[in-house]
Structures are given as structure tokens and as C-alpha cells.
Amino acid sequence: MPYTVVIMGISYNLESHKMKTSDISAFARVLAIEAGDLMLSEREGAQLSYSFKKGTELVTSADLAVDQLISAKIKQKFPEHVILSEESSPDIGRVEDLSSPLWIIDPIDGTVNYAHGHNQSAVSIAYADDGDIEVGVVLNPFTNELFSAIKGKGALLNGQSIKVA
């Protein structure tokens, strides 16, 4: 069922079938913003619990909560899409068909910084179709910096075009 979202004054019509990359980007930006809000509230409002995956990689309860939020929204909107997430499904070997739509997620990129109260962490979401990365979104909710890019169309910071340095 179609629905419309408005981001920075631009309306995007979101459909559950094959979508334009601009609509995928809009959806990913909405996800990143919601995930960023959860990152902030998890760190401000509760005691973070910690564990280690593979014995050495720090993972927090916030990593898992943000991962669950993003994954659930993608599955709800696109049940046929594959999700590759650092926290819940980190093994690329589990992705059998790279030609199908694929979401690549790092729910909290910079977990160590996040866990130690530093603001250098972000939500990272990418979308690939037919083996090619088409859309990338990175949000640092602490600095309100939302980076987004669409293959062949350049990159934006908070909706403004940016150039490679």
C-alpha cells in the first residue's frame, strides 16, 4: 500500500514494489532518523547493558534495540528484501542471492565511542540492488548530521549538496 513521507519539504511516494532510488533514500533517511532518536534515548534514559560478540567486539543493548527497530521496519515494508546487519545477521555468507534487494545495516557505527559517552557514532544504512550499492545514509544524531547519497547523483549533508575533498 502506498504512503507519502515529507523530508526537508520534498514529498516521496513510497510503494512496496520496485521503488525509485529517491524513494528508497527517503525511506532509509526516515529509518535513520527514527534509529537516531532511539540511540539518543537509549543512552540518556537507561543503563546500557554490554556484552561481547566473538569475545572481543563490544555490543550494547542499544545496538540490539536500534538493529531490531530498523530490521522490523524494513521487513514490514519489504518482506521480500534481505537484511545484512552487523548485529543480528553479520555473515555475508548467509546472503545467498546478491541480485535480490539487500539492506546493509550497522545500527550503531562506533559502538565503543557510543558506550563511553562520546558523540562520534552514527546509524549507517545502505541499500543494494542486483549487487550494486544504490543508496547510502549515515546519521550522527548527536550532531544532527544526515549524510545521504544515491548512486550517480552525488551526496548530501542535511539536504545540501556536498563535494569530495
Model-inferred region functions:
Residues 30, 34-38, 112, 138, ...:
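Charged/polar positions on well-ordered alpha helices
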Residues 94-98, 117-118, 139:
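Short loop/turn motifs at secondary-structure junctions and domain boundaries
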Residues 92-93, 112-115, 146:
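Conserved protein kinase catalytic core
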Residues 101-131, 135:
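Glycine-rich active-site/cofactor-binding loop and its immediate structural neighborhood
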Residues 3-108:
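N-terminal subdomain of lithium-sensitive/metallo-dependent phosphomonoesterases centered on the IMPase/IPPase/PAP
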Residues 125-165:
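Acidic beta-strand-loop-alpha-helix segment within the catalytic core
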Residues 89, 109-111, 143, 152-153:
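Short, flexible active-site-adjacent loop segments at beta-strand->alpha-helix junctions, enriched
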Residues 63, 111, 140:
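Conserved G/P- and acidic residue-centered "switch" motifs that form tight phosphate/ATP-binding loops
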